[in-house]
């Protein structure tokens, strides 16, 4: 069976970031407002630094009472404006970031629902949840939150440097000699963060996957005494995640210490050169205080600009994981043949199918015809290819070779949506969603059905006898995955869903295999009401349930090894007869 190619070409950080910024376009007005507010906030910081000169010179040296009275008012006004601008920046950036995360989640979720079935075999659901959860948040942080920090701190650093140049270009140029060293440090930090970020994202997905497997199988874990081994496995994964996290902390600590050391060298240079300028009479005490406070503003700004690299690189690593999903090809859907309601003639012609990475085919040279309105039973040992066969009809997977036809046309000739409207599926593992009974029966495109149709479907599926006893009737909630209902009740709701759909093709995948005798009787009775006038394919575990099938296909190792009616196959004395005899002896025992 065909799969998708997940080996995406390598792209640079800038290409990834540029593509990421495209998600910010719908919010550009918010971002422009945030940028203007950030400029005002940075100007407020620079203005406060500039006030250091009159505060020092006019208040403490020249004793200017008039200036001293107005300076506190100016400082208060400055910080009111700066605070308002900071609030606008935070709100606009926050709204943009959360909106981008929401858009990414919806886009990736929509993409997952358009991917072929092979994707769900190659990527575990916990990994998908990581992409929809923390990956989307970290991408939003990289796209907006990191930009906010970079803009705010960069503007403040630029403003402080401009102020320093204004008061003493000689001192400022002396400090700027350290800029290449700082740039080298930031580049090294960014590269290391990106390497570690990829590993951390994968490690988090493995942790979630391990927890999901263990907790969802808690009964098996307890009954087989596997708590210790599962905890050791999870602990090992958690330890690896911790080691990677500590590498991030180590990088952050080293980079912070390095930036602070560079800042200390800069301060020392400032003191040395400014002292010489002051002795020469070219620098007042106010100028010196401005230079000093500006430098003390620059150092934390540079520190934050270095630390924000972690946020950016983690976001870029998450973006690459999300883009690998968005860039995956959708299910092939180029069908043009119109299809309103199929007659139900299904034909397999020499169909071979293979799962990715498997040497032996799941199906090999399978050929048969299912006439409209007939029942075709598919039986065989576990792993013989029964489920693989029926998954090809709605094109959950694609065949490697051969043809599958519906009403004389290859199934690829129909649009996927039209093809799947012709099929109702009732499986052994019924999937109910956390909602009401009515919402689960009238599911998907059937949401617009009227109350009469819904009740007739539930009545026909022998489900009304238990639905009527529930406190809220059709509006009763079924719980997560239908956990508030028994297996037989869930199965009857699945049959009601199929009845409501009224599709010309019905697929039953071991629909009664896990039920007790009473539940099986009710479900079989409901199925007998559902099957007439439809092309029905039944995967049967209990051979007694398919004795009246129009044809029985016996599969072994991906091939049809016998075919005929129940009586013909018993008379043949082959594999079917052997399986039937085994089940008969089990029932007698």
Swiss-Prot record:
Reaction catalysis annotation: ATP + H2O + lipid A-core oligosaccharideSide 1 = ADP + phosphate + lipid A-core oligosaccharideSide 2
Gene Ontology cellular component terms for the protein in this record: plasma membrane
Keyword Cell inner membrane in annotation: yes
Disulfide cross-links: none
ABC transmembrane type-1 domain boundaries: 32-314
Name of the top EC class for this enzyme: translocase
SMART domains found in the cross-reference section: AAA
UniProt-annotated binding residues for ATP: 380-387
Domain of life of the organism encoding this protein: Bacteria
Keyword Ribonucleoprotein tagged: no
Domain ABC transporter per the UniProt entry, residue ranges: 346-582
Pfam families assigned to the protein according to its UniProt record, in alphabetical order: ABC_membrane (PF00664), ABC_tran (PF00005)
Protein family according to the UniProt entry: Belongs to the ABC transporter superfamily. Lipid exporter (TC 3.A.1.106) family.
Known partners and oligomeric status: Homodimer.
Protein name per the record: ATP-dependent lipid A-core flippase
Classification of source organism: Bacteria, Pseudomonadati, Pseudomonadota, Gammaproteobacteria, Lysobacterales
